[in-house]
Structures are given as structure tokens and as C-alpha cells.
Amino acid sequence: MLWTICVFNYADRQAIFSVFPLLEREMNLTPVELGLLGSAFAWVYGLMALLAGMVVDRVRRKTAILGGLHVWSIICMATALSTNFRHLFFFRAAEGLGETFYFPASMSLLSDYHGRATRSRAMGLHQTSVYVGTIGGGFFAGLIGQHYGWRLSFIVFGGLGVVLGI
């Protein structure tokens, strides 16, 4: 289950890069604005990581993971409502906040469930989900975006995340 959630964690964050040309055309975004969209998620994610770890130490890890999954998935879907740069920037930053709780909680769970003999293997397997999500997210967001519009990419990814969390 952690592996699949992590796939969506990375697919959702990667999706925007594959639809940059569509966003640029529809919203007349500048290269600087595209760069800011690309980094908004990372700034919030990076700045909130320590706080997220402290929160995860005080709540049930499963709650942090599933709560984060629902929050970031709903925000991902809401991204489709964007009509300008400010909306996109807000949703990207908010999604970064939602996703920041996943890794502290998942690494803690993996450490607890796997002893010295299997811990590295478990974390290595989990790490593969990062690349599957990044590659798959980029590919499918671009594919969906080209054929059905960029908004549907975010609706599909976010919707699948919500279903996964149920």
C-alpha cells in the first residue's frame, strides 16, 4: 500500500511539468512563471519537512499518510479549476504542504516493520515507487493532457488518489 501511495505522491507532483506547454499557451505564462510553478511545490515541501516530521511523531502514522493522501489528491483535482498563474501557484504550493507528511510517516513505518535483516531491502523497494511515479506521472499527464486537456490530468490523478485512500 505504501508503494502505491508513493507512486501517486510523485506522479501528482510531476504532472504539471508535462503540461507546461499547454498551460503556457492557454494562460500566456512566461518562462519565469513556469519556473515559479515548478518550484512552488518544492519550496513549501522543503520548508515544511521538519514540521511535518514533528507532527507525524505526535499522530498515528497511518492517519498522517491517508490524511495527506486525501488532502494532496483533492488539491490536485482542484488545480483543474485554475484560470490564471496565481491559482496554479497556490494549488502547487498547497499540494506541497499536503505531500510533505508522507515521507516522515512512511519511513517510520518501514523502519518499525522491518528489522535489520530486511530494512534496507524494504526501503530500496519503496524507493522504486519514486521513479515509477515520476516517469508514469510525466507520461500519463502528458498523454491525457494532449488528448483531453491539461485539466483532466489533474482530475484523473487526484481522483485516483482519493479512491486509493478510501
Segments (PLM) and residue ranges:
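Helix-loop-helix hairpin linking two adjacent transmembrane segments in secondary transporters
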Residues: 126, 130-166
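Conserved MFS/SLC helix-loop-helix module at the cytosolic interface between two early adjacent transmembrane helices
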Residues: 47-85
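Helix-breaking motifs and short loop linkers at transmembrane-helix boundaries and internal kinks
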Residues: 28, 60, 81-87, 98, ...
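Extracytoplasmic
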Residues: 1-31
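Residue-level signature of mid-helix packing/kink "hotspots" within the transmembrane helices
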Residues: 14, 42-50, 134-135
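Small-residue-rich segments within alpha-helical transmembrane domains of MFS-like 12-TM solute carriers
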Residues: 10, 14, 80, 96-104, ...
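Cytoplasmic helix-loop-helix junction between adjacent transmembrane helices
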Residues: 91-132
